[in-house]
A protein has these predicted regions:
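Bateman (tandem CBS) regulatory domains
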Residues: 110-114
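DNA polymerase processivity clamps
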Residues: 1-44, 48-100, 115-232
Length: 232
């Protein structure tokens, strides 16, 4: 849960609430949300034995430390909230963090409706193709990758004035809709794909300048949203 959201917190102190992850507990469900205004990560998880609803913001730095303590095979984690603190009981370890003050923004309105294009793609192939294409983008100092869809293929390209252009193609499955061109930050995209623990990724595009969504195929528990970059 932490690894799938914490990477998207803001590192800027201009809006302190965005340096934390919003934990919303209601109706036996935990919804974790993190955003730095350029991307958004959401993870949903069913809970047991919830005594009351909560809406708190936990500092991203504290969650990063907690993640180091937790091992993958821990059966249960007990969580206790006080007015301005949270306690995690992990095995024999008690981990206490302060809570951030303020109201977390309503991020549900960021999600567009009615996609123009939807497709499925192999997570590993997509990730490594972006990684290869981003080498030139990083050389150019901008991290921008251009993506175009069409005929069951996704084409990725990046350009460096000094070196030239690199192009990568990845096969897409279950393509709905026409063709589209969009640009994005390669690091944001790779972070999002890494957070999706699934071999197949579903991508929904809503327009060249609208946010696009990634999630595991057939699973709504993890959602990654990325804002595009204007290049076209």
């Amino acid at each position: 849960v932490i690894a799938q959201t914490n990477f998207a917190v803001s590192t800027s102190e201009t809006r302190p609430v965005l340096t934390g992850v919003n934990w919303l507990i209601q109706e036996n469900e935990l919804i974790c949300t993190a955003t730095d205004s350029h991307r958004l990560a959401v993870r949903k998880l069913q809970l047991e034995d919830v005594s009351e609803n909560k809406n708190v913001i936990i500092p991203g730095k504290a969650l990063a430390e907690l993640n180091k303590i937790m091992s993958d095979n821990e059966e249960d984690i007990d969580i206790f909230f006080a007015s301005n603190q949270v306690l995690f009981k992990v095995g024999n370890v008690n981990f206490i963090s302060r809570l951030l003050e303020g109201h977390y923004p309503d991020t549900t309105r960021l999600f567009p409706e009615n996609y123009e294009i939807k497709l499925s793609i192999d997570n590993g192939e997509f990730y490594h193709a972006i990684d290869r294409a981003s080498l030139l983008a990083r050389e150019g100092g901008n991290n921008v990758i251009k993506l175009s869809t069409g005929d069951d293929v996704v084409e990725l390209s990046s350009t460096s004035p000094e070196i030239g252009t690199v192009k990568e193609e990845v096969d897409a499955n279950d393509v709905e809709g026409g063709s589209l061109k969009i640009s994005f930050n390669s690091k944001y995209m790779m972070d999002a794909l890494k957070a999706i623990d699934n071999d197949e990724v579903e991508v929904e595009f809503f327009g060249t300048m609208k946010p696009f969504i990634l999630k595991p195929k057939g699973d709504d528990s993890v959602t990654q949203l990325i804002l595009p970059i204007r290049t076209y």
